[in-house]
Amino acid sequence: MNILVIGNGFDLAHRLPTKYVDFLEMIQCFKSITNEPNIMKAGGLDNIEKPIYAFLDRFIFEECALRGEFNKLIEDNFWIEYFLQCPMYQKENWIDFESEISNVIQSIDFDMKNNNLKLDDGASIVSNFYLEKFFLKRLSAAELGFGQDLHVSTFREMRDVLYQDLNKLIRAFEIYLCEYVENIDHMKISKEINSLGIDHVLSFNYSHTYQKLYDKSKNIKYDYIHGESRLNNTIESNNMVLGIDEYLNKKS
């Protein structure tokens, strides 16, 4: 049996925009367009030469239901705001989602342990600047009479908001992969890969690139180790996994 193990390098070798920075750049373009009244009123983009703009022109102006879902997923999402403000992303146009998520979780764990606080104690001490800024903004909105359900007063509530926003982020990434990445049709087939005679694919990707380009027989078995992207999923049914480092020791 010939088994092929693939990771994100496989998609990148086929020139697919599957890096996290590609996803963030799409979000920035999406926000710029949907927040511009004149463009929305015009009902379309004037320049769609770049593939991402051709996609957004269709996605925003023709697929209103999906656009609405996507907008709700990314709106006031802590993780998206955090990643976009991350110094590494702003300076070097690179980011590691898993590492940054781990950093935020560790900062909360540190705040609680260092100050002898528990989950149901008030989150009055927050050492992470971006975390404090984000929840202060939500608190200000609640005090003004907007979004009362967004008020966060305990570490437990903070944890729950971060978890909900993480699930929203993953679902938004799933839509990006299904609607944009998997509909790119100018990928080149590798003769070397095509001649391997693969029986089983173990994929650490969420996408279906090998299946789309090389599986002509439809007899190949697939295992998606970190889950796979499906457009008809919901936040609840999505099975894509974003992993983080195990930083707690056995005594913790």
Regions found by a protein language model. Name each.
Residues M1-P51:
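An N-terminal structural lobe/cap that precedes and organizes the functional/catalytic core
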Residues M40-S252:
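Extended, H/D-rich, highly charged conserved domains that either
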